[in-house]
């Protein structure tokens, strides 16, 4: 099993090119099932979850061609299987995203209940409730969601999510584009990745209004065409590298980004004492060798502070000047990195969904174990600033969401390498 060896204490300097967003690429790939012609998706990151989605689409009968630049062509005209099996779905929660498209286009889908990161239940009940309201007959039995469309086509409905759900919004959005009539989604997720999916669907002929707001209206069409689309850049990867610059007191520029999607993070970096310069598709952070100031964080749905950046800011706050409060409102059980950061000398107290972080002068390298995707990123960041060697185990978690992280950090001056026990 691979692990990362990090010798910390070096300020990071330089530029890093940000990859396409996994959380946009996965629903867009799932949405290719809706098209009657082939689609070509570019700026797709080379990640384990992407490979899993390709395997899943292939198992359903789609024909995929991938070139050396990770341009992915999907032809779903020959789809003839309607089962998303446990062996694929268990490794990636986003597999649930094939449910809406398969039900809308083919009228049936059997999808194993999803897996993914071990950060709470993240139930799919909200997806199923909305699809049932649109006319789907759904049962959950033996670990599978069995969905059938009773009337040939799903029916447009007025829907309201009890709580904001990104994958739920995406699943229903994809189902609604081929439904009969108009679907209105209230309390919809406003994340940029939802907007990116909507833009992809619109390019294929869908009629969607309001993506990026809390109310999305979809007028169903008979079919969708093929097309080409470039996936948006990964705002969480961008924030992670900016955090690496901040906690090592360095200067890091992230390129090929959309600064408008980073605003909640950028405000907090400025609050921490960073000097920011923002261009059309780049952001530069400079700490001028200053220790970051502690910043309070409360996660909430977009456009508020992203839960996927909580762990990285905790790593920064661990070595910041002062004390901070971090409140996690999205997922339970998302403080599993705390115990590992404490092994490195971090001073953190937990009380339910709140962490109190008292910044320390230095962290010390230690063997630590990643428990989920973003927790692994926080441990890598801590290793970059710690004295001595840090060994991060179970880095298959980080490979699910970060493309060549050790190579990109090395380009910024980090002493980091991947080794294998095999």
Swiss-Prot record:
Protein name according to UniProt: UDP-N-acetylglucosamine 1-carboxyvinyltransferase 2
Residues the record lists as 2-(S-cysteinyl)pyruvic acid O-phosphothioketal modifications: 117
One GO location term (cellular component): cytoplasm
InterPro entries, alphabetized: Enolpyruvate_Tfrase_dom, Enolpyruvate_Tfrase_sf, MurA_subfamily, RNA3'P_cycl/enolpyr_Trfase_a/b, UDP_GlcNAc_COvinyl_MurA
Gene Ontology MF terms in the entry: UDP-N-acetylglucosamine 1-carboxyvinyltransferase activity
Gene (UniProt): murA2
Record's keyword terms, sorted: Cell cycle, Cell division, Cell shape, Cell wall biogenesis/degradation, Cytoplasm, Peptidoglycan synthesis, Pyruvate, Transferase
Cytoplasm found in the keyword field: yes
Annotated function: Cell wall formation. Adds enolpyruvyl to UDP-N-acetylglucosamine.
Class in the EC hierarchy, top level: transferase
GO biological process: cell division; cell wall organization; peptidoglycan biosynthetic process; regulation of cell shape; UDP-N-acetylgalactosamine biosynthetic process
PANTHER family: UDP-N-ACETYLGLUCOSAMINE 1-CARBOXYVINYLTRANSFERASE
């Amino acid at each position: 099993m691979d692990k990362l060896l990090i010798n910390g204490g070096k300020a990071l300097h330089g530029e890093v090119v940000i990859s396409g967003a996994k959380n946009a690429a996965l629903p867009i790939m799932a949405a290719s099932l809706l098209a009657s012609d082939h689609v070509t998706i570019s700026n797709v990151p080379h990640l384990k979850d992407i490979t899993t989605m390709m395997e899943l689409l292939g198992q359903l009968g789609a024909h995929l061609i991938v070139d050396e630049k990770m341009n992915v062509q999907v032809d779903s005209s020959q789809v003839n299987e309607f089962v998303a099996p446990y062996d694929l779905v268990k490794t990636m929660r986003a597999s649930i995203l094939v449910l809406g498209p398969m039900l809308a286009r083919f009228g049936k889908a059997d999808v194993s209940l999803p897996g993914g990161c071990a950060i709470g239940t993240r139930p799919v009940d909200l997806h199923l409730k909305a699809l049932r309201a649109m006319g789907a007959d759904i049962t959950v039995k033996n670990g599978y969601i069995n969905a059938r469309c009773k009337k040939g086509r799903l029916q447009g409905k007025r829907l309201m999510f009890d709580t904001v759900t990104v994958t739920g919004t995406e699943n229903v959005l994809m189902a609604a584009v081929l439904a009969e009539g108009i679907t209105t989604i209230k309390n919809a997720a406003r994340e940029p990745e939802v907007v990116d999916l909507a833009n992809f669907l619109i390019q294929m002929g869908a009629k969607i209004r309001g993506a990026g707001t809390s109310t999305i209206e979809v007028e169903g069409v008979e079919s969708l065409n093929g097309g080409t689309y470039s996936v948006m850049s990964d705002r969480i990867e961008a924030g992670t590298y900016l955090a690496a610059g901040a906690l090592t007191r360095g200067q890091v520029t992230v390129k090929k980004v959309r600064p408008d999607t980073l605003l909640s993070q950028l405000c907090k970096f400025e609050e921490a004492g960073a000097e920011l310069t923002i261009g059309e598709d780049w952001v530069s952070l400079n700490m001028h060798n200053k220790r970051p100031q502690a910043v309070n964080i409360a996660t909430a749905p977009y456009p508020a502070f992203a839960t996927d950046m909580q762990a990285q800011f905790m790593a920064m706050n661990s070595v910041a000047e002062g004390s901070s409060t971090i409140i996690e409102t999205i997922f339970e059980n998302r403080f599993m990195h705390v115990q590992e950061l404490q092994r490195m000398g971090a001073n953190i107290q937990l009380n339910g969904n709140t962490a109190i972080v008292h910044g320390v002068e230095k962290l010390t390298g230690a063997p630590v174990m990643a428990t989920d995707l973003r927790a692994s990123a926080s441990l890598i960041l801590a290793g970059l600033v710690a004295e001595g060697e840090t060994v991060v185990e179970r880095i298959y978690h980080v490979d699910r969401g970060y493309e060549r992280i050790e190579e990109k950090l090395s380009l910024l001056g980090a002493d980091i390498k991947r080794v294998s026990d095999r």
